[in-house]
Design a protein with these regions (language model features):
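VWA/integrin I-like adhesion module and closely mimicked acidic/polar interface patches used
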Residues: 138-179
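Short beta-strand-loop
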Residues: 63-93, 173-179
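Acidic, polar low-complexity linker/tail segments
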Residues: 1-26, 31-41, 55, 115-125
Length: 226
């Protein structure tokens, strides 16, 4: 069993078995102390819904790759779930506590994307432009986060990545907006499940270059606060 698990983690074997074009998607999640209680519970429910929705989509399950970056603790950043095809993704159970080092978390996301792009190239696997979803109920607490935000905007302007900043109730949208050239959105209440279902359908359409992709991208009424 140990040998089998080791083989499953070797990316070259993974790409040999599945050479489909990939759509990389990174979730940068604020798991600071203010997310304790119902917010973190609903976030975990949303991640579980994302797992099921992607696995139920035969095409997306083999084309979408996920990575989760957790911002928490004493300005700590953790790769909660490393790059994995959606078909093999298991939603982690997130726990809340500590501060909100969003700058460090977003830089980590950019670095992991660069590394994965190099891996795709070395394996002869094509890929769509990566997506990053930054989700927070507050604002950055780490020193130098403005520099990290500038790196994010630069990467997006140069078409290396698409970044969406999503704020829940209480989030400082003015500061979250600095991480993207796109306007930030605010989640209605704790509608994490509705948001992640939208995300799943959107990345699925993008991964398949579906003609109705823009329809799903633009229709955010189920979770976006007007």
């Amino acid at each position: 069993m140990a040998e089998q698990n080791t083989i499953e983690r070797i990316p070259y074997v993974e790409f040999a078995d599945n050479a489909n074009e990939r759509t990389p998607c990174v979730l940068v999640l604020d798991c600071s102390g203010s997310m304790r209680g119902e917010p973190i519970k609903q976030l975990n429910a949303g991640l579980a819904a994302l797992e099921k929705e992607l696995k139920d989509d035969i095409d997306a399950s083999s084309r979408v790759q996920l990575l989760i970056v957790k911002a928490f603790g004493k300005d700590e950043v953790k790769i909660e779930s490393d790059w994995i095809d959606a078909m093999n993704f298991t939603a982690p159970t997130m726990e809340a506590g500590g501060l909100t080092p969003l700058g460090k978390a977003m830089e980590t996301a950019l670095q992991k994307i660069d590394e994965q792009k190099c891996l795709y190239d070395s394996c002869g696997v094509t890929s769509k432009r990566p997506w990053i979803f930054l989700i927070s109920d507050g604002e950055p607490t780490d020193y130098g986060w403005e520099d990290s935000a500038e790196l994010c905007r630069y990467a997006q302007k140069n078409k290396k990545v698409v970044i969406h900043a999503i704020g829940t109730q209480g989030a400082n949208l003015e500061k979250l907006a600095k991480f993207s050239i796109l306007p930030p959105k605010r989640l209605t209440g704790l509608k994490f499940t509705e948001f992640f279902l939208w995300l799943s359908r959107s990345v699925s359409c993008i991964s398949k270059a579906a003609p109705n992709a823009n329809k799903y991208l633009d229709d955010i009424t189920e979770w976006n606060e007007k």
